[in-house]
Curated annotation (Swiss-Prot):
Signal peptide: none annotated. The keyword Transcription regulation applies. Component of the Mediator complex. This is Mediator of RNA polymerase II transcription subunit 20. It comes from Danio rerio. The gene is med20. It is found in: Nucleus. One of its GO terms (biological process) is regulation of transcription by RNA polymerase II. Belongs to the Mediator complex subunit 20 family. Component of the Mediator complex, a coactivator involved in the regulated transcription of nearly all RNA polymerase II-dependent genes. Mediator functions as a bridge to convey information from gene-specific regulatory proteins to the basal RNA polymerase II transcription machinery. Mediator is recruited to promoters by direct interactions with regulatory proteins and serves as a scaffold for the assembly of a functional preinitiation complex with RNA polymerase II and the general transcription factors. GO terms for cellular component: mediator complex. InterPro entries: Mediator_Med20 (IPR013921).
């Protein structure tokens, strides 16, 4: 995998979520990007059932990514995180006396993958309880694993179809003690999705937000 940036794109004025997604699709296709199937990323929230200390318990987020169908990522609120195989979901069921699934808190992003030269772009509709809450854009530069070596190129590419909505360098990279010149890993991508999902959970349901 390469360096990845995940961001939320606002719904265009006077447009629905789906209309804005379609607009982004057209912009990518005008650049010459080619569709390469679909993708999905989801996140389920768990909270500890027993806490003898009286302190608020940290939440546990269990995430899946269609790019890694045999893996499961788990991130504690504020860190740390781990990557395991799909049997981790079975383990969480067996640990239900310790971790309770927060019903109604599942968030997912589903959409279309595009390939443009060395870039992989994923435009997704972020949904919660079958209601669209926003739009996610993931851009991966597959030819590099060092953020500091390719960010300017990635930003220039994103400006070509996101315009003023082009994001700044993700904090998951700037917060690393080693700086921008350490190889990325899958947890960097999932941490960005988790940050985005946490934001959309707090948003109001958008008009015309039924997921098709």
């Amino acid at each position: 995998m390469g360096v990845t940036c995940v961001c939320q794109v606002p719904v265009a004025e006077g447009k629905s979520v789906q209309q804005t997604v379609d607009l982004l699709h057209r912009k990518l296709e005008q650049l010459g990007a080619v569709k390469q199937g679909n993708f999905w990323v989801d996140c389920e929230t768990y909270h500890a059932t027993g806490n003898a200390t009286g302190q608020p318990s940290k939440l546990l987020y269990v995430m899946h990514n269609s790019e890694a169908p045999l893996s499961c990522m788990a991130l504690f609120e504020g860190g740390p995180g781990l990557s395991a195989d799909a049997n981790f979901d079975v383990l969480m069921i067996k640990l239900k006396s310790h971790f309770q699934n927060a019903k109604g808190h599942k968030v997912e992003s589903r959409g279309t993958r595009y390939r443009y030269c060395d870039f992989l772009v994923k435009i997704g509709t972020v949904a919660m309880s079958s209601s669209a809450r926003g739009i996610s854009v993931e851009v991966e530069y597959c030819a590099c694993v060092i953020p500091g070596d390719c960010w300017n190129l990635m930003k220039e590419f994103m400006q070509s179809f996101l315009g003023s909505n082009t994001p700044e360098l993700p904090t998951v990279f700037t917060n690393k003690a080693e700086g921008l010149y350490v190889p990325v890993d899958c947890m960097d991508t999932m941490s960005q999705y988790l940050e985005l999902f946490s934001k959309v959970r707090k948003q109001q349901v958008l008009p015309g937000s039924g997921v098709r």
